């Protein structure tokens, strides 16, 4: 298992390994806007081309992976940002009662794209149908689109200094011609450049501890608590409190001396890293003070600070005199926090490894620096393989994902090296449907459309005698009742598992315990019978003894 980094510049695209020196270039790749590249599972890479109404599709896995363009998808107009809404990891077959894993050729449910004017497109990828177009999603260009909570919600940010949270079902609903956002955040005063969502997520926003971090050119970082969005019960119970059930709660605001371009969070939500024109800085969200005291910066300090949140100012450690714990306590009392400088460069994009130990920093010179967070040392620098470094431009997209080493530990297999099948001239026969330009009329019930979808392999072999709740609920209840009675049996249960021909044969000692119980019951019955017989014999003996004693007395 290794990690690969995918980054694009104004004139090139590169795929490299984080822990090795393997590297390849993507052909005919040109981007000018950030977040214009999105990875579709572990198979495809979508890149919106600069100054062209076109999406280039690259194949990154299997025996068909290539450096050249796999497929081109024409668009109604030029797109700036891309995002996909993935399918769930397991699909349930109601007829067979079997869970199916996702197949190799698996397309996401939705593809979202934005334009320079703030228009939002929503396509269904399995059919290519244009489900909806939101003409004025933002007043200006959208800077980022992200789906959260398994695609239930969509978050967009734009140059109009707003962050909008949408519900996915509203965007794709055929009966909703003009979808309304769930909430709008307009605390920033300049364009919002980036945002990140915490890793602590659940099924719905109202029952999770999801936090949203937004950064802007106004040199501020704002953290919101999204757990109160859409909570109607809390809204009715607290009608006087405007912070409940309507908009996210602003937990904290961090001000910096520089305009912020990018932000990335630690996988465990312990720290955040921001990229500016003056370098990359790290901020610990669990701030350490004198001794062993640690302060949670995202915890509300009181009732009066719920609406506006706490405000902190970030200062560099090297600008302090000494930088000891006593200075940190004094600065914290004044609302100032000390942040570490990771790298001095003009940062354009940031990304972090899956274990949170490495920080990938993309700059305006077209280079990606891999830095160790603990030591703040540059491990290696990745550049585009080209002869003219001056024309590369800045890093516009930066992605990381794990992958398995296959085919002799080759990261990427070029078109000339790969052993392609003899059929179809070595090309993948599974193609992505073309994206339509006209909105699908969902109100016409007789208007049907085809969806090409491949079903994966069953997740596991199921026992035919095993009742499922969707098939036979009464039988399922009886089965659960039997299992509960077995596991609640008095005494310890010791199981012996034997593996024969890759099949598990489990024999439990419950049967032997039941046999022992029957023997004990039978023994108790026998003992009672013997006791009763003994009492009768004793009574007879006492009577005979009394008669014998009387006969002796008469003599």
Curated annotation (Swiss-Prot):
Whether Nucleus counts among this entry's keywords is yes
| PANTHER family xref list | WD REPEAT-CONTAINING PROTEIN 18 (PTHR18763:SF0), WD-REPEAT PROTEIN 18 (PTHR18763)
Q: What is its main location?
A: nucleus
Q: What does UniProt give as GO cellular component?
A: nuclear pre-replicative complex; nucleoplasm; nucleus; rixosome complex
Subunit structure of this chain's protein: Component of the RIX1 complex, composed of IPI1, RIX1/IPI2 and IPI3 in a 1:2:2 stoichiometry. The complex interacts (via RIX1) with MDN1 (via its hexameric AAA ATPase ring) and the pre-60S ribosome particles. Interacts with RIX1.
Q: Which regions form coiled coils?
A: 513-554
Biological processes, Gene Ontology terms:
DNA-templated DNA replication; pre-replicative complex assembly involved in nuclear cell cycle DNA replication; regulation of DNA-templated DNA replication initiation; ribosomal large subunit assembly; rRNA processing
Q: Which SMART domains match?
A: WD40
Q: Give the residue ranges for region: Interaction with RIX1.
A: 460-504
Tell me which InterPro entries the record gives.
WD40/YVTN_repeat-like_dom_sf, WD40_repeat_dom_sf, WD40_rpt, WDR18/Ipi3/RID3
Q: Where are the WD repeats?
A: 29-68, 90-133, 137-176, 187-234, 255-296, 342-383
Q: Which family, according to the similarity comment?
A: Belongs to the WD repeat IPI3/WDR18 family.
Please state where this protein is localized.
Answer: Nucleus
> What's its job?
Component of the RIX1 complex required for processing of ITS2 sequences from 35S pre-rRNA.
Q: Which residues are recorded with the post-translational modification Phosphoserine?
A: 388
Provide the domain comment: The coiled-coil motif forms a homodimeric contact and facilitates RIX1 complex oligomerization.
Q: A Gene Ontology molecular-function term?
A: chromatin binding
What keywords are annotated for this sequence in UniProt? Answer: Coiled coil, Nucleus, Phosphoprotein, Repeat, Ribosome biogenesis, rRNA processing, WD repeat
Q: What name appears for this protein in its UniProt entry?
A: Pre-rRNA-processing protein IPI3
